[in-house]
Regions:
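Extended helical coiled-coil dimerization/tether regions that scaffold
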Residues: 22, 170-324, 330-342, 523-528
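Nucleotide-state sensing region of NTPase/ATPase domains
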Residues: 56-149
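Acidic, Mg2+-coordinating catalytic modules of nucleic-acid enzymes
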Residues: 1, 111-121, 127-221, 399-404, ...
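Contiguous hydrophobic segments
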Residues: 259-269, 274-276, 347-364, 374-410, ...
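Switch/communication elements of ASCE P-loop NTPase nucleotide-binding domains
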Residues: 1-65, 69-72, 277-288, 293-432
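Residue-level detector of alpha-helix boundaries and kinks
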Residues: 36, 105, 130, 155, ...
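N-terminal intrinsically disordered, low-complexity tails enriched in polar/charged
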Residues: 1-6, 99-101, 529
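Generic structural motif
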Residues: 11, 24, 69, 95, ...
Length: 529
């Protein structure tokens, strides 16, 4: 699954908008100031694939090109057309180059899902449900399929929630040696090297009587059927002394009721693998674990882990938010490594420490191996995360008077260093210094090249020069070339820009051109020989 190109007529602040993703992307990172529309772009893609999967009328007009299962797919959607059959037009180019137009019904109802990704994952690190709400129809369909006892319930659109980090961790412990691939770090090695997790000590499931009823199914578990019923039966067989208890539960509104609860205790990896033995792969096992949450029977999961150098086991809830965040994203990538999937991640790095931020894309590649079949589109405001990327992996979204535009960086972030990344077009900062220090530098430079300093200004200059020298800055007035450059610079610089935190691309280019012009003048004047 690879996105190629997207044009949007009008969605929120994206009007006459276009973005090209390149030819062979695994990851595409969106940069831009707040309000440029990065999250809106992710939201638009979720809506597009939601509607394509459901065979629904388009919510807005767009043109989308992407590759899926060796097919090149071209979708033209116009929500203003009166006839429903004309609103979405699709052309498919086969591997042999033959191009065929197909109907929307054939496209969305194809039982083999030849033209759509197996999964579209969404993740948003903030508290808003702006992204989550677009997954409601698919989650409800998945929920209803489970209640009906469908053996393979459908769920192509998947919104990642924090509770699923626990399921991802449990699925990591089930990986076998046969599943290891070239270029991909083993699950056990990943847990040990990155998180210091030596082993799984125990897992304690608490499940409660659901709000739904069922006539047929396993009578032990409220007549649960399908994926949920099978999983509860496997859990029951593997657990040490399963317990059924009645417990009074208080609702959010303050009312109380008595519900039946099951308690299942698994003694580490051996018991967990007894449950896993009934599933073909980690993906199916993860789906079974998640069925307890989707079906509203999960009360809690307590996972105890042994960490390197720790005397006492720790619980999953004691892990940091950054660890839980990383487990979920990498787990989903890992479990769908052989599937055609699209990951739409809105700032998935918010809780990562600097060391993990620098390695973020290495972690991703270790999760999927050498031949990724997915496309990860993510937003970030973290310069460390993009420090290893080539320019082709990055898109800068910029807001101008006529709309939002997307550009490729002029240089590779890789090799620039964090300070240069921050002051380049990638983030546009005027300086990486704190503002009080930068203001001291600006004022000291003004005084340095002043032809006539008053006595108070002379005292101010000496004070600032000493303060900056103590901080490690070389700002003396004995450097003739430096002073000549600063004098020309201050004479031409827009003084208002000194109070700007972020510069526009146009302002950055103007300053670069001014700097080049000044250097040419200094060379012509004989300052360089």
């Amino acid at each position: 699954m690879k996105l190629r190109n997207l044009k949007i007529a009008h969605f929120k602040n994206l009007r006459d908008f276009e973005i090209n993703f390149g030819q062979q992307p695994f990851t595409t990172v969106l940069l831009g100031q707040n309000g440029t529309g990065k999250s809106n772009l992710l939201e638009a893609l979720i809506i597009i694939f939601r509607d394509l999967d459901l065979g629904a009328a388009p919510a807005f007009s767009y043109t989308l090109d992407y590759e899926c299962r060796t097919y090149e797919i071209h979708v033209e959607a116009d929500h203003t057309r009166q006839k429903r059959g004309e609103q979405v037009q699709i052309a498919v180019t086969k591997p042999d180059g033959a191009r065929e137009k197909i109907t929307y019904n054939r496209f969305s109802q194809d039982p083999e899902r030849s033209y759509l990704p197996s999964y579209v994952f969404g993740y948003y690190s903030g508290p808003s449900n702006r992204m989550e709400k677009h997954f409601d129809q698919h989650q409800n369909r998945f929920y209803q399929d489970q209640l009906r006892g469908e053996e393979k319930p459908r769920r192509q659109l998947f919104y990642a929630r924090s509770v699923q980090s626990q399921f991802a961790l449990l699925a990591f412990f089930t990986e076998t040696e046969q599943e290891e691939q070239p270029g991909r770090q083993s699950a056990r090695q990943f847990l040990k090297d990155l998180l210091g997790i030596e082993k799984l000590v125990s897992v304690y499931f608490v499940l409660h009587e659901p709000p739904w009823t069922s006539k047929d199914g396993d009578a032990r578990f409220w007549n649960a059927r399908g994926v949920l019923g099978d999983f509860l039966a496997h859990l029951y067989d593997a657990a040490l002394a399963p317990m059924r208890l009645k417990k009074r539960v208080v609702s959010e509104l303050g009312s109380s009721t008595t519900l039946e609860h099951f308690h299942f205790y698994l003694r580490g990896e051996e018991d967990l693998k007894k449950v896993f033995a009934h599933y073909g792969n980690q993906q199916e096992f993860f789906k079974a674990l998640e069925s307890t949450y989707i079906s509203k029977v999960l009360s809690e999961v307590r996972i105890r882990l042994q960490r390197s150098g720790a005397e006492e086991p720790l619980t999953f809830s004691e892990m940091s938010e950054g660890e839980q965040q990383l487990l979920m994203v990498l787990g989903l990538l890992r479990f769908t490594k052989e599937e055609e999937a699209l990951f739409l991640l809105d700032e998935p790095d918010t809780h990562l420490n600097p060391a993990w931020s620098v390695q973020y894309f290495d972690f991703m590649h270790q999760a999927v191996g050498d031949l990724p079949t997915s496309h990860v589109l993510m937003t970030t405001h973290n310069p460390l995360v993009i420090s290893s990327l080539k320019r082709e992996d990055v898109r800068i979204m910029q807001k101008r008077k006529t709309g939002v535009f997307v550009e490729l960086p002029r240089e590779n972030p890789q090799g620039m260093g964090v300070s240069n990344i921050l002051t380049s077009e990638l983030f546009g900062l005027r300086t990486t210094l704190d503002l009080p220090t930068q203001r001291k530098l600006d004022r000291q430079r003004e005084l340095t090249v002043s032809d006539q300093r008053t006595l108070p200004e002379e005292a101010e200059w000496h004070r600032l020069t000493q303060e900056l020298d103590d901080m490690g800055f070389q700002v003396g007035e004995d450097d003739e070339l430096y002073n000549a450059f600063i004098k020309k610079w201050l004479a031409r610089e827009d003084s208002d820009l000194r109070e700007h935190i972020v510069l526009t691309p146009e302002q950055q280019r103007s300053r670069e051109q001014m700097m080049e012009k000044i250097i040419e003048e200094l060379v012509a004047e004989g300052h360089w020989r």
